[in-house]
């Protein structure tokens, strides 16, 4: 695998952000042995830090991704020869090789085929391996959620007229890095008219009195494990209409959360949500796909399982049964089509044998009013 998150899952090695896209590191994990790691920086730096990988940390074999145009590329074949040699060493040359996490998978498969090695698609194997979290993983995710709560608190404290969406993103990210976050995506921050229709970015719009502001602490990683948690705030006193929209969104998300436990299917959970895209004023599920959805989370922002109204409406898609140890993010949006505001909420939920546990603890039951000088 060349996938940074799967490399970390298998070996504990953290691939830094600049090195992720170039694919200078990979792991070979034999079915009858321990993993071998190729890294793009100095092995001497990491060997003392990773005693569990003793004798199995290898120097860079070259950067094939920027240059390879076909399967005969000599640098690409450095990796093919290295893997082939290890397969021979472990006596597994007749086994299939699962490939994962490279943009040049077709070239690798062709090069391995010439050596008599059959390749298969490896991503689902790793997805399934990571889908159920251990107690250690869950505890790390609790810490990540606590860090996200600090970020949301920093955002709430900063909301006032004149502050821009990008300022709120900066406040949230600063709080995360103060707590040792090792990576984060840019927070989603939409305000006022930007909250309807739903969007997931941020800009330099200035917050004004009466605006709703929704913020997603998404992709914040502690020891690699991520969060994805939306909250909606109001700059000043909220109107009754805004409070009603918020309550509608809260009821929608928690009606689904209350269904969660091991043995329930994703389709049963989604059955708690609107049964037609017309609810939001649209004609097709594709137009409203993000408005009531869910996804697993862990070392990636989007682990299995996926709860998608589009997938559910697609003929032949089978339901997924929830299992204890899954961590799922559920997210909903409400607002009138063509309206001037919208509400977004999201919770991180641990699936348990007898129910669920909401891991995200930042207050959610009522619309939080920020900058209220007239109380």
Regions found by a protein language model. Name each.
Residues 1-375:
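Active-site neighborhoods and metal-handling regions in enzymes and metal-associated proteins
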